[in-house]
Amino acid sequence: MKNIFRRSVQIFHKDKKEGDKQDYTGSSGSSGNSGTDRSPTSSLSKKDKKHSKHHQNESYSGDNSPTLSRNHHDEIGHLQYTANHHIATSHHSHSHNHNHNHNHQLTQPIQQQQQTQHVNLASNNYYIRHIYTNNQYDETTQIVMNNGIPFIYNPNARKIFGVPLTQVPCRAGSNVPIIIEKLIDHIERTSLNSEGLFRIPGVDLTINQYIKLFDNGEDVDVSPIEPYTAAGLLKRFFRDLPVFVPQSINKRVVSLFIDEEGKKKPVDMEILSNLRVLVHQLPTVHFEVMQELTNLLGKLMSRSDQNKMTISNIAICLVPTLNCVPAIVTYSIQMHDFFYNEVFPQHHLYYMRPYEEKLVESAPTQPINIMTTSGGEKRYSSRPASITISGLLPSNGQNNSPSSSTITSTTITSPHDSTAPITFTVTTTFSPEQQQQMLQQQQQQQQQQEKQSSSSLSQSQQSIQPISDTNSTKSDRRTFRVDPNLDLTQYIEDTQYNVNRNYLYNGGPSGTTGTTPNGGSLSIGGGNGGNGGSSLSVGSGGGNGGSSLSVGSNTSVGVGGGGGGNNTTDQSKIYRRSVAYTNNEDTKAAIQQIKEKIDRYSKEKKTREEKEREKLLRYSIDLERYKDRTINNKQEKRASRDINKEIEREIEKKRLSPRERLNLFGLSSSSSSVNSTLTRSTANIISTIDGSGGSNRNSKNYGNGSSSSSNRRYSNTINQQLQMQLQQLQIQQQQYQQTQQSQIPLQYQQQQQQQQQQTTTTTTTSSGSNRFSSNRYKPVDLTQSSSNFRYSREIYDDDYYSNNNLMMFGNEQPNQTPISVSSSSAFTRQRSQSCFEPENLVLLQQQYQQYQQQQQQQQQIPFQANPQYSNAVIEQKLDQIRDTINNLHRDNRVSRDYTHYLREVEDLRSSLQKETVVSNEFIKNIELEDKLRREEEKNQRLIEEIHLLETYFILKEKSKAKRLSTTKDLLTRSRSPTLPSSINMSTSSLGSSSSSAYNNNNNNNNVPK
């Protein structure tokens, strides 16, 4: 809201626009004829009439020209229509009204097929001829001619965009322009839920096309326009207006909200009522357009949850376009009923429009049109409000005035239709003791009459019964009810009101009240009682005078000859009287009480709504806090989870040596990668040749783990490179074996071929690019013992791995240990050696031969128990593996906790830094306060010293003056001739002594204290 009021102040620092040259305060009466002059069915101009007379050799023009529809479905029919029209007028010279007789012929399909080509040529030729004859050849016509679109320019059409609002065409009986009605209706039906309406711009090309169509005078269909383009077209219309809100009203509105010093005033009901008065002082057309626009914006704001257009967003988007103070728009939207739905039927109260006269008149017989001094018809043509006070008629004639009545019910109607009157109804009830007695007597008489006339009233029952049913709710207010079977005329004659029957015929004098016994109504008129001319008779009986308005159960208006008299009335309204007052103090007091009650109810409703709004706001704030808390918790959990993953990833990275990482990622040289693959292949050979079940299981687990990890971690390109290197290595091995065939026996060659087949199968499953394929990882089968642990493999050094190969391969004889150790150590040494040296290959072959011999011997020798590798030793080894796994698990937990502790330490450190900064500032503030206090004390002491010095100097001056006066006295006495010399000497001595004493006193006073 601060930005809105800032914008309202900035508007009036700008230069006054050139378009605001009209004085709306005195010329709004001339706009009264806008309902007829600006209608689209207005008469033709002189130029159009002259053009229609010579229509034989010229083109048609004016408002009667056929317009092109925007729908593609009817385009061909309209083209044929225009072409046939021009061909007929150019060759046969028919009248201009001949155009409307061809519609039934254009729908025939045969005629459409025959004339399609001729129609296009005729329409385009006519368009070109029409442009050149009127000298209207611009960019639009060039585009139309290039594209072949038959756009007919109408030079006599009335412009809509960029003209004053009073010149825009409207419908008959309305002051709102047609374009605004169409666009607002389209937006209300289709676009209220569109997000960012009036904020997101539409398509400029489409907006410009529709502007040209509207300015050309065509009946445009706005239903196919998309929401944002329709809103942009409406904004363009308001932006092109010369003046929408006059600057005089804008300045007065700003003065309501901002004082002389430029400060914002607090908004209260007095300011809003003054703003309402200023809004009602707009010209009539501008007022109605503002009412329609704010109604649309209020509906748009009510759906701000979907379209995101709150009151501030609407003000930001539309206030610069409307060029008015934001308060006019914002408060009109938020309090639309307060600003535009009047309690009284008139458009404004009479004091809101001082330049309009005769706004309030006496109640006429028919609705009248309110006229201004300039003769223009205003838009509100309803009779003034009639105020009715109703009640029971008392038994005596003393309480005829409503001054002794009490208000029992009030009715206030405020319809949106301006032509319907608004009625204040104040119902009063008289219930004295005599009245109650009279009612009891009437009930007794009624019971007697029912017994007598039960057979004679069968016909009247059919006519009276429906009337009594319609007003049964009103009859419930009384203390008695009349039987519907009762004969009305007979009952009235038997009542005590027959005494006053002469009032019905004679009546009172002119201007007095006359009581009519028929219906018991009281009428006020300018004639003789109930039968006077131009009188208003309100009640159940109606009136019998000329030009009288009778209001009864069957309300009718009789104009001339007593048309409204002798109404068939309801029994429930027999004892009611209704009086119309124009200037009565009691009626004004009743209206004032009603207004106060309305204000009180509105204030209570406002306070209730404010409490509910505060409650909802409090709940929404709590909800937002809860949402923020949950989002922060989720983010913290996600961050901690990411940190734990990073820690695990780092731990897994540390398990690999740098050389193995290079081999896995393919970053090392070809020799090192081939060397690593060779070592892996040899290890796989040993694992596959071993006949024990445990080693086979280990090899299977090893291969499966490697294949699954390779699919997850490494790309297919690295796998292909490693396979190519393996194939090259196998080819080189085969070539070398061919050279050494003379030294190797045939059995060994067959075994070697089997070995190569096994290596190809195992290496393809492992795929070479395995993160866990090095000798530093030891596969362990812990299916029975360590199933609850997370890790199933352990990190070992090369020496540890080589020493435990015997246990894994199932070697059970002690004499075979040095050979297996040497073979495993030879395998591990292959990491740092080149695989292309023939000596290494020979050593491998020898080691393999020794290993095969050992296996054969093992098969021949029976099983012998080896105490070195018993079950206890194996369990010991398994316990060691479990311990290592537990240690690793503990290390992981410690690392996680450590990161969490580090984070907490960082948070504590940051909070401590903030607290230290705050504490330092607090200490500095305390020091400054102490310093200021000391300075103040010092200044106070200085001020006291200054006061003492001032008093000291004042006393010193006084003493000096006294001393001078005493010396003068002594001198005068010593010089007097009458005194003897002895006395003079004594006085001189006394004077000298006194002067010396005074000097001593002065010296003592000068001594600093």
UniProtKB/Swiss-Prot annotation:
The keyword Cell inner membrane is annotated on this UniProt entry: no
GO BP: any one term: small GTPase-mediated signal transduction
Biased composition (Low complexity): 26-35, 104-117, 394-415, 432-468, 512-521, 547-557, 695-713, 981-1009
Residues flagged as site, Arginine finger: 199
Domain of life of the source: Eukaryota
InterPro entries membership: Rho-GAP (IPR050729), Rho_GTPase_activation_prot (IPR008936), RhoGAP_dom (IPR000198)
Pfam families to which the protein is assigned, alphabetical: RhoGAP
Parts forming coiled coils: 580-656, 715-743, 839-952
Listed Basic and acidic residues bias regions: 12-23
Chain positions covered by the region annotation Disordered: 1-72, 89-117, 388-420, 432-482, 508-571, 686-713, 759-781, 965-1009
Compositionally biased intervals (Basic residues): 89-103
GO cellular component: cytoplasm; plasma membrane
PROSITE patterns per UniProt: RHOGAP (PS50238)
Protein function: Rho GTPase-activating protein involved in the signal transduction pathway.
Protein's recorded name: Rho GTPase-activating protein gacT
Native source species: Dictyostelium discoideum
Upper lineage: Eukaryota, Amoebozoa, Evosea, Eumycetozoa, Dictyostelia
